[in-house]
Structures are given as C-alpha cells and as structure tokens.
Amino acid sequence: MKLFMNKNEKYEEPEVHMFFHKQTKEVEQVEKFVRSLSITIPAKYEDEIYKLYPTDIYYIETIDRRTYLYTASRVYESSENLLSIEKLLEAAGFIRVRKNCIINKYKLRSMMISKNSHIEAVLGNDEHIVVTRSYIAGIKEAFAR
C-alpha cells in the first residue's frame, strides 16, 4: 500500500482519498479507521464534560457499574456503558481483554507473562492490564498485526 501526503493551505480540514483496484480487508480497515477519527465520546472530568477522541484513550473499564476512560494523564467517567462504547470504537482499534475492559490496540506496547502466569498487556503509558484467558487469542491477533 502506498501513501501520498500533500500539505496545502487551501484545505480547511484533512481529506483522505483512497484509490484501489479491489476491495480488500486492508482497504476496509483503513476506511473504518479513518471514519472512526471523527468519533468523539463525551466524558466527565471533575465538573466538566469533554469530548474524547479514540486516539487519546488508552483503555476503558467498568468498575461498580461506572465506566472510566483512561488517557495519558487523566481518568474520565462516561455515562455510556462499556458495550455501547465498544461497538462505537471497534473500528478505531479497541479490543476486549476482560469482561469489564477494552484496550486501544494502537496503544499496546508489549505483552508479558506475569509471575502468576497471567498474560498482561503493557500499554504505552506503562499501564499493565491483565488479559483473561478467553480473550488471549484476540489480543495475540491484534498484537501480531
């Protein structure tokens, strides 16, 4: 796949054009990812509501029926449930690693086996997320790509 970029002052917002001979999985993935860049999730920090972009979120988890979104520097709370956020962010590269947690695969730095034989996903912010057995195949596949 080739990438051409052209910076031009006449464009007020970025445009993405795709040229392809055949619709492949890779083409579909690029399309879904580009479309996901315009998605925002409203989330609360202290007394303010912010619009978070998927690219800023490292992982999302539910604790005691509350949904938390973790970025590099803050933890936000969302009124949405994890399942609805997961469906919204699937094209943006979010994958489930536990019943109550999804991670941004683009923030996944490495995987390691912990002392008690659990697999941990290590994110770019040095956060270690335990992956439960039923989701190991999915995260291994995401890591291999």
Model-identified regions with their sequence ranges:
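Basic, polyanion-interacting recognition surfaces, primarily
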Residues: M1-R145
